[in-house]
Amino acid sequence: MRLLRSILYRLYAIYDKACPLRYFIQKIRLYYAKNVICRSGSRFANTVFEGDNLVHKRSLLVDSYLSRHSYIAFDCRLFGARIGKFCSIGPRVYTGFSNHPTDTFVSTFLAFYKDTRKVFGYSYYTGLQPGFEMYRKTASGYLVDIGHDVWIGADVKIMDGVSIGNGAVVAAGAVVT
């Protein structure tokens, strides 16, 4: 009976009423195969988990790699991040910001610096601006590279192309460029 209660408690902890069944099944598989706990509301796409991880509520991981024994707090948005072992990522940490051109002209509207005909039906894009990279990648091929045993505080924003070394501590509210 005790074992059954334990199993039901763990299932309830990751169950999300608004979550499609396929996410629930993925979370169950991750838990039993790699001891990865993904709380309700957490989502991931094209993300690799090494195992023994915890992803808290409402966090989103896309195109990322999470090494062993790393922890993601609630409300994080991690796009293209490689996270090392034994990392603690605080709440509301964001990665994967795209850049806007500022050298030859300044624009915030996507249609001026990227071909948007498929999305909007029109585009003002005339070709790649020299020296402009919309997404800057690190040497590992990810947008953000976080080393081993790193502690990142709450409300941190990490820009594209940043590598954070092993053992680093990033203060709460920091913008890492």
Regions inferred by a protein language model and the residue ranges of each:
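Domain-scale signature associated with acetyltransferase and cell-envelope carbohydrate enzymes
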Residues: 1-149, 155-156
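Beta-rich strand-turn-strand
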Residues: 158-165, 174-177
